[in-house]
């Protein structure tokens, strides 16, 4: 068994690239001394310490695909966040959809019938600090499922190992509902209930002598999954949980320490989502988590790459992060 995982690609298509350029121009101007300083700081932080230069993300993505081809995997899993989420509303934004569709189409061409695609938080929609608007949208979920073929839940079996993919944004739905459209909330709740039932049924049906490799974009979902009795009972059978979202593996160690700080609930959407998600970080380790880095890491190639998973003849499961350089 050979698996290759790529996550948090964040490639910008032509439409998002133009929006990003306009946004960066706006962030570098500002009015008033304090506002100008704050906006320039945000501009530099986005450029240098998180998403790096958008012009180079595609090069990192293409190089990552080359490295995956050389590995000859049985399955390739894309662990969410394909585009830049320029509008803060996920795939319902035309430019974001264009970016994500380009990524997914190319991967299917290179790895036909060997790809699984996951939802990331930015694919469904998430409030944007930069443009100060956005949130989850049902249209984004529907576009991803119906047009791009991203499944909220999927399962494959390779001998005695079950590969299970889940939609972390449905599990952590309460974190995002304050920014949802009011008329969509009942349908969101229905979809969450349906998704949780799929996940718990899969674990209930798991034979006691077989193992799971779980794929989950946002680690915040793990603290809610462990609350389900059937998952608590089966946690020893979870060989690995492959995470995305964090862009680089060292942040997993950092967030382990953050919950020890005094609890608080910020009113600002992004701060609130992070605070609520981190409260259960001490439970994540039940899932044997490992972070798949973004191909470009967190800027300037810091810990960027892809993740390889291999089963040895003596039934051990080995993981290896492979650095991507351009």
Summary of predicted features, one role per range:
Residues 66-74, 109, 157, 162-164, ...:
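His/acidic metal-ligating clusters that form di-metal
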Residues 10-15, 83-87, 117-129, 171-175, ...:
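Active-site environment of divalent metal-dependent phosphoester hydrolases
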Residues 249-326:
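Binuclear metal-dependent phosphoesterase catalytic core
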Residues 1-94:
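N-terminal active-site segment of His-dependent metallophosphoesterases
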Residues 8, 76, 81, 100, ...:
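Divalent metal-coordination and catalytic microenvironments
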Residues 13-47, 163-210:
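Active-site-proximal loop/helix segment associated with metal-binding centers of metalloenzymes
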Residues 91-197, 232, 237, 265-292, ...:
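Extended active-site neighborhood of metal-dependent phosphoesterases/phosphodiesterases
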Residues 1-4, 13-17, 154-168, 207-211, ...:
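Beta-strand-turn-beta hairpins that frame and shape the catalytic cleft
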